[in-house]
Amino acid sequence: MAMGKYSRVDGKKSSSYGLTITIVLLLSLCLVGTWMFMSSWSAPADSAGYSSTDTAKDVSKNDLRKEEGDRDPKNFSDEKNEENEAATENNQVKTDSENSAEGNQVNESSGEKTEAGEERKESDDNNGDGDGEKEKNVKEVGSESDETTQKEKTQLEESTEENKSEDGNGNEEKAEENASETEESTEKSSKEVFPAGDQAEITKESSTGDGAWSTQLVESQNEKKAQQSSISKDQSSYGWKTCNVTAGPDYIPCLDNWQAIKKLHTTMHYEHRERHCPEESPHCLVSLPDGYKRSIKWPKSREKIWYNNVPHTKLAEIKGHQNWVKMSGEHLTFPGGGTQFKNGALHYIDFIQQSHPAIAWGNRTRVILDVGCGVASFGGYLFERDVLALSFAPKDEHEAQVQFALERGIPAMLNVMGTKRLPFPGSVFDLIHCARCRVPWHIEGGKLLLELNRALRPGGFFVWSATPVYRKNEEDSGIWKAMSELTKAMCWKLVTIKKDKLNEVGAAIYQKPTSNKCYNKRPQNEPPLCKDSDDQNAAWNVPLEACMHKVTEDSSKRGAVWPNMWPERVETAPEWLDSQEGVYGKPAPEDFTADQEKWKTIVSKAYLNDMGIDWSNVRNVMDMRAVYGGFAAALKDLKLWVMNVVPVDAPDTLPIIYERGLFGIYHDWCESFNTYPRTYDLLHADHLFSTLRKRCNLVSVMAEIDRILRPQGTFIIRDDMETLGEVEKMVKSMKWKVKMTQSKDNEGLLSIEKSWWRPEETETIKSAIA
C-alpha cells in the first residue's frame, strides 16, 4: 500500500514536472538577480573580505573626514589597492572550492554575510547543481563593483585637491603646511577626543541585515558622487551672498536694525543702542575691510594693531592727548593710558590696590566688570595681575572703542545700561569698575546703580573713579551728594576715598553688604527690596527695576560665602552645589568633577597637540555652549581668554562658571551676538547645533559664526553625525577647510579653518540700510 501510494504521488509529479521546473528557475533567477543588484551597491566591502568594522571605518573616515588632499596619497591608495587585490584572489579561491561541492551542501564563508546573502544561499542550495556557476558570476560582479568604488575614491581625492587650491585671497595655502601632520595625528588622538572608549570602539559597527534601509556604505558612496560635482554646486545650493548694509564690514544685525531704530518713540534711555534683532536672521556673509590682515599676536597686540583691520581715526583724534590711541603709519598704537590714567594702566591698577589692600588682585578679586571701558587698557593690563576683566560699552559711543579692545585681544562686548538687565546672573562679579564711564548712576531712583548691585557679589567692591570724587565744582558736588545719599540707602559701605597725585585723579571704593541687617533697619524702604518672586538670575530681555534683592544668608545657598581664592576656585566644586542635580543627571558635584576631568583630558592630549592649531595665534576664544566652563578651565594656563556662553534654553550653569573665576554671558543663538565681526580666533561648539536645529535656521547660525570668526580662525564642533554632516556641507560651500575629523558611534568632531573667501554676489538687507 505504501509503495502504491508513493507511485500515485510520483505520477502526479510527472504530469506537472515542467511547470514546477519553470517556476523554480524563475524564482531562482529573480533571487539571484536581486542579490546581484544589491551586491553591486552594498556588498563590495564584504565581498572583498572586509569585516563590518572595516566598513564602518571607511564610512566614518569619508563621511566625516579630514580634507583628502592632506593625506599621503601613496599610503592611502596603495594600501587599499593591495587589500582589494588580495581580497579578489581570496574570492576566486573560495568560488572554485564551492563549485566542487554538492548542490545541497551548505557552503561556509570566512566573511560575515548579510541577511540578503544568507537568503540567496539557502535558495541556491535548494536548486541543486548548476547554481555554483551563477554564484561565481555574482562574486565577479561584486569584485568589479569594488574596483569601481576604489576609482570613485581616487577621483574624489583628486577633486578635493583641486577644490582646496582655490582661495579668494590666496591666504588659504599657509594652513596646508600643517594639514598632513594633523591627519597623522587623527587616529592617535581619538582616545583623547572621545576618552570614554578605546580606538576600536570609535569605529565599531555590527553587521546587520539591510532590509528596506539604506546602508552606511551606500550613503557614503552617494555622498562621494555628490561631492564630485564640485563645491560650486554647494555654493549655489546655499546661495551665499555678501551683505550689502550701511555698516559694511562692521555689520552687527541686532544693533544695526535701522528699521526698528527709526520706529523708536524715544532714545532717552539709550534704546537705540539696545538689541533690535531683525525678524529673520541674515543668511549673508559680512565683507572684509580693504587690506585686512591677520591680527597681531598677543601681547604685542595690546600695544598696536593693524589700522586696516579697524580703519577708524576719530577716536585717535579726540582722545590722542589722553594716550588712548594714536596713529603710527600702518598701525594704531595704544600707549596704555586712559582718561583716568594718562601715565599708564598698571600704575592706576596698583593705585587701586594700595587704596584698599583687601581687594587683592588675582587672589580674592578675580572676575570684574568694567563699565564704559574706552579701549579697555584697564582690562588689558589686569592680565598682569591674574585678573579677568569683562569690559563693555555701547556701540559707537566713542567710535569703535569695543572693536579696538577686541582687536587688541582684550575681553570686551557691546552693551548698554538702558532699559534692560545686563545679560549676567546676579551676584557674580567680585568687583565692578567705572572710570569716567559717563553713566548717571544717581537719577531715576538709582535704577542703573541698582542693576550693578544685582550683578555684584555680596562683599564685592564698586570702584568709582570719576570727577565727582575729586572735583568740587557745582555740578560734580551735586552729583557726589546724590551718590552719597543713594549708596547709603543701598547699604553700601564707603570703604575709602583716595587720590592719585601722579594722574591727578581720585577713586571712591564701596562695598556691598553681606547680610540683610542694614536693609531691615532702614527708616524708609527706598530703594525698595525686590519681591521674593523676582529672580535675580533672570537676565535675558528682562526690564530693569529700581529694587534690590535680599542678600542670601543661608550658607548652603549661592552668594552666602565668598568663593575660594584664585586659582583654587577654578577646580573646586562650590559647596552650594550639594543640594542640586547636575546637568548630566548625577549629583552636581560629581557632574562638575567628571566634566572637569573630561575637558582636561581632551584639551591636554588632543586639542593642544593633535588638532593642527597654532595656539600662539589664538587669543580670543568662545565656548558657545559652556555648561560648567570645563573647556575654559582646561585652557587657563594659556595666554588667552574664553567667553563662556550659556544658551538661554540650556540649564542655567553660568553662576557656576563665575564661581570658578571665569566669566560668560547668556545668549540665544537664533539671534546675532553682541560683538563686531571678526572678533574671535577660535569658536568651540559642543553639542550645540543638534539642539539649535529644533528651533533655529542653521544656515543663519553658520552665517553668524562666519561673521564673528576671524579669517584663518578655527571652528571646533562636536555633535551627532547627522548634524556634523550638515555643518560640513555648509562650511565647504563657504570654502572653509575641514582640517580634522573624528568619530565614535554616532558622535563626531570637526576642526575647521575659516577661509578668506567672500561671495561676489551681494544681498541688500533692508533692515540694515540707514
From Swiss-Prot:
Top-level taxon: Eukaryota
Record-annotated membrane-spanning stretches: 18-38
Name of the molecule in the record: Probable methyltransferase PMT25
Region feature (Disordered): 44-238
EC number: 2.1.1.-
Lumenal side stretches: 39-770
Record's compositionally biased regions (Polar residues): 92-109, 205-220, 227-238
SUPFAM superfamilies (UniProt xref): S-adenosyl-L-methionine-dependent methyltransferases
